[in-house]
């Protein structure tokens, strides 16, 4: 890696991690398509997932080392802020497409669906049971991670941030496990009409984002334990909080629209 002493930014050296992450994401996408067409693809998806995790870990490790060396100036951190904001905006557009699909079919059901929504034969989940508990988990986790951030800004590096992060990680993990339990007990699958397809795509991709956010929180917890954050320099943790709040907002919208409003209850 080279750095020009007269430049506000550094120029990273060649890195293989973006290439491996792209290949892994492509492999997981192909595996998902094959699985939806009832073609065995667990080996491809498993290998792609392992490669994705290892590549992401290595990429984050190099990025953290660059910051520890001193390459992350305030101009670089500002560019990171802009990039994370644009990344979250792209994620908003990603979920917007699925919500659009849901509204297109819910507001104007086709003849194939019996002009009804939910379609006949679909027993939708009760919004006041499991999903309400999941909503409480994510809202509580958002409050705890915000309190952890507030404690860090007040130069409390001992109790406040640790408790907030640990509780948030536990809430995210429990949310994912409860979501899997709900999938197990649902009376319909992803192949049962457009409702099943959109429901599992929305909740499934949101669950994947919960997993990513939980891993990011774990990385932030380890970095906090190693003393890599300060009250002024902790953008990695701050970006994680942005992402987690985005996950919270998406779930609240999903619960209100999919479970409550158009859930048939």
From Swiss-Prot:
<feature type="transmembrane region" description="Helical">
    <location>
        <begin position="83"/>
        <end position="103"/>
    </location>
</feature>
<dbReference type="GO" id="GO:0004129">
    <property type="term" value="F:cytochrome-c oxidase activity"/>
</dbReference>
<keyword id="KW-1133">Transmembrane helix</keyword>
<feature type="transmembrane region" description="Helical">
    <location>
        <begin position="159"/>
        <end position="179"/>
    </location>
</feature>
<keyword id="KW-1278">Translocase</keyword>
<dbReference type="InterPro" id="IPR000298">
    <property type="entry name" value="Cyt_c_oxidase-like_su3"/>
</dbReference>
<keyword id="KW-0812">Transmembrane</keyword>
<dbReference type="InterPro" id="IPR035973">
    <property type="entry name" value="Cyt_c_oxidase_su3-like_sf"/>
</dbReference>
<keyword id="KW-0496">Mitochondrion</keyword>
<feature type="transmembrane region" description="Helical">
    <location>
        <begin position="198"/>
        <end position="218"/>
    </location>
</feature>
<dbReference type="InterPro" id="IPR013833">
    <property type="entry name" value="Cyt_c_oxidase_su3_a-hlx"/>
</dbReference>
<dbReference type="Pfam" id="PF00510">
    <property type="entry name" value="COX3"/>
</dbReference>
<feature type="transmembrane region" description="Helical">
    <location>
        <begin position="241"/>
        <end position="261"/>
    </location>
</feature>
<comment type="similarity">
    <text>Belongs to the cytochrome c oxidase subunit 3 family.</text>
</comment>
<dbReference type="GO" id="GO:0019646">
    <property type="term" value="P:aerobic electron transport chain"/>
</dbReference>
<comment type="function">
    <text>Component of the cytochrome c oxidase, the last enzyme in the mitochondrial electron transport chain which drives oxidative phosphorylation. The respiratory chain contains 3 multisubunit complexes succinate dehydrogenase (complex II, CII), ubiquinol-cytochrome c oxidoreductase (cytochrome b-c1 complex, complex III, CIII) and cytochrome c oxidase (complex IV, CIV), that cooperate to transfer electrons derived from NADH and succinate to molecular oxygen, creating an electrochemical gradient over the inner membrane that drives transmembrane transport and the ATP synthase.</text>
</comment>
<dbReference type="InterPro" id="IPR024791">
    <property type="entry name" value="Cyt_c/ubiquinol_Oxase_su3"/>
</dbReference>
<dbReference type="GO" id="GO:0005743">
    <property type="term" value="C:mitochondrial inner membrane"/>
</dbReference>
<feature type="transmembrane region" description="Helical">
    <location>
        <begin position="16"/>
        <end position="36"/>
    </location>
</feature>
<keyword id="KW-0999">Mitochondrion inner membrane</keyword>
<comment type="subunit">
    <text>Component of the cytochrome c oxidase (complex IV, CIV), a multisubunit enzyme composed of a catalytic core of 3 subunits and several supernumerary subunits. The complex exists as a monomer or a dimer and forms supercomplexes (SCs) in the inner mitochondrial membrane with ubiquinol-cytochrome c oxidoreductase (cytochrome b-c1 complex, complex III, CIII).</text>
</comment>
<keyword id="KW-0472">Membrane</keyword>
<protein>
    <recommendedName>
        <fullName>Cytochrome c oxidase subunit 3</fullName>
        <ecNumber>7.1.1.9</ecNumber>
    </recommendedName>
</protein>
<feature type="transmembrane region" description="Helical">
    <location>
        <begin position="40"/>
        <end position="60"/>
    </location>
</feature>
<dbReference type="InterPro" id="IPR033945">
    <property type="entry name" value="Cyt_c_oxase_su3_dom"/>
</dbReference>
């Amino acid at each position: 890696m080279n750095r020009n002493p007269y430049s506000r930014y550094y120029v990273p050296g060649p890195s293989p991690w973006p290439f491996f992450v792209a290949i892994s994401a492509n492999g997981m996408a192909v595996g998902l398509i094959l699985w939806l067409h009832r073609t065995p693809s667990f080996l491809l998806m498993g290998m792609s997932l392992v490669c994705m995790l290892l590549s992401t870990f290595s990429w984050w490790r190099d990025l953290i080392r660059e910051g520890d060396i001193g390459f992350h100036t305030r101009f670089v951190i500002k560019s990171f802020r802009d990039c994370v904001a644009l990344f979250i905006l792209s994620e908003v557009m990603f979920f917007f497409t699925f919500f659009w699909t849901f509204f297109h079919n819910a507001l104007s059901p086709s003849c194939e669906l019996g002009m009804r929504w939910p379609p006949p034969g679909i027993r939708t989940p009760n919004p006041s049971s499991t999903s309400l508990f999941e909503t409480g988990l994510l809202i509580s986790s958002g409050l705890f991670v915000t309190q952890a951030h507030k404690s860090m800004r007040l130069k409390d590096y001992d109790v406040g941030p640790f408790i907030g992060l640990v509780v948030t990680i536990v809430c995210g993990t429990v949310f994912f496990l409860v979501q899997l339990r709900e999938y197990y007990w649902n009376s319909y699958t992803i192949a049962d009409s457009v409702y099943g397809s959109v429901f599992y795509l929305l909740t499934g991709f949101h669950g994947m984002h919960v997993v990513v956010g939980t891993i990011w929180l774990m990385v932030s917890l380890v970095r906090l334990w190693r003393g890599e954050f300060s009250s002024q320099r902790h953008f990695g943790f701050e970006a994680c909080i942005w992402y987690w709040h985005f996950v919270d907002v998406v779930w609240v919208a999903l619960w209100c629209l999919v479970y409550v409003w158009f859930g048939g209850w």
